[in-house]
Amino acid sequence: MVDRLLAFDPGGRGIAHFFVPGGAARAALALRHAKRVLLTTGFSIGPGLPETDGPPGTASLGRALRALGAEVMYITDAASLPPLQAALEVLGEPTRILTFHADGDAALTARRLLAEHAPTHLVSIERPGRARGGDYLSMRGESVGEWNAALDELFLQAPRRMVTVGVGDGGNEIGMGVLRARLARAGARVSKVASIVPARHVVVAGVSNWGAYGIVVELARLSKRPLLHTAEDERRMVRACVGAGAVDGITRKREATVDALPLEAHAGMVELLRLVQDSTPHGGKTR
């Protein structure tokens, strides 16, 4: 049932060409007993224009992992830090956020951060991954490299033993590199922007936030604990992200929408996912 919800493609992006059945379930299995998780998010489509997609999903998944005993850290760039912090604050989560600076040697910075914080798992939710030509591209095929730090270097520099998870909805995000053959068949537009940065586990959804929520539901089913946030939390997170400077990644408007879908569409998706979660016997319901 989680797959059916994540495969819903209201934006008509054609994710059926590269949807990965069971992706959320496999990611949850890999994350269930994680010790130290470093999560990244943030996709800026212009100067000072971070998206509303990504931070809510990251905050929700981070909260779930922390509830299961993991040490959770976050990393993003300066532009996307305020929306991520805002989403975490809505859920009452600690805001331990590292900032990845765009200047200098990104590969060296990534190796230093990995050595210093020693995560066992790396998770990216709606974060741009470089395309074949080395640039970072929006779904419109426009370069966004100037406004997004090279956080994909964390995945490129990660040792093989480290578990990596990538969540995306357009093919141009970190992790989608393992789907290059499928993305090539999805059409010229998707093929052009497709990321070459791989992850061991990939989750594709109609909206990246939903992909993260799908992992949370699968974690809830595995642990028999209610972990997903509420529809009201969803509304508050998106509004808080906008208040912190985020915009809709498609309309580019500073309003409480995500990927051109109204707030109630996202609240409704959370309600549906909570129904799936609550169909598994556990000790109670999330607040």
Region annotations inferred by a language model:
Residues F43-I45, R127-R130, G170-G171:
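Short glycine-rich anion-binding loops that position phosphate/pyrophosphate groups of nucleotides
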Residues E51-E71:
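Histidine-anchored nucleotide/phosphate-binding helix
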Residues P82-A87, V165-G168, N172-A184:
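Glycine-rich, charge-decorated loop segments at or immediately adjacent to ligand/cofactor-binding or catalytic sites
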Residues A86-L156:
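An acidic, phosphate/nucleotide-engaging active-site surface
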Residues A70-A79:
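Short internal beta-strands
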